[in-house]
Curated annotation (Swiss-Prot):
Signal peptide per UniProt: none
Record's protein name: NADH-ubiquinone oxidoreductase chain 4L
Domain of life where this protein originates: Eukaryota
Organism of origin: Galeopterus variegatus (Malayan flying lemur)
Keyword Electron transport listed: yes
Length: 98
């Protein structure tokens, strides 16, 4: 396995561990999700360039579109939560109140 794949998998794992461990603020959770999406995008781009399949070139673009949608929804939720509650702590959110 080339070292670039190991680095990308380690970046994904570090973002996943950050998402699971540092869940106190909503903004830090969003940043960890963006790190995961960035590492998946780089991995999909490198794999599609190495495989030379014509249909696989659209996979990174579709992944980038979903990452942009996830970012927009996450920032909209962050603005709404900070406007309603005054802070972005995840512990203060309760899904039963919505």
């Amino acid at each position: 396995m080339p070292p670039i794949y190991i680095n990308i998998i380690l970046a994904y794992t570090a973002s996943l561990v950050g998402l699971l461990m540092y869940r106190s603020h909503f903004m830090s959770s969003l940043l960890c999700l963006e790190g995961m999406m960035l590492s998946l995008f780089i991995l999909a781009t490198i794999l599609s360039l190495n495989l030379h399949f014509t249909l696989s070139f659209t996979l990174p673009i579709i992944l980038l579109i979903f990452a942009g949608c996830e970012t927009a929804v996450g920032l909209a939720l962050l603005v709404m939560i900070s406007d309603i509650y005054g802070l972005d702590h995840v512990q203060n959110l309760n899904l039963l109140q919505c």
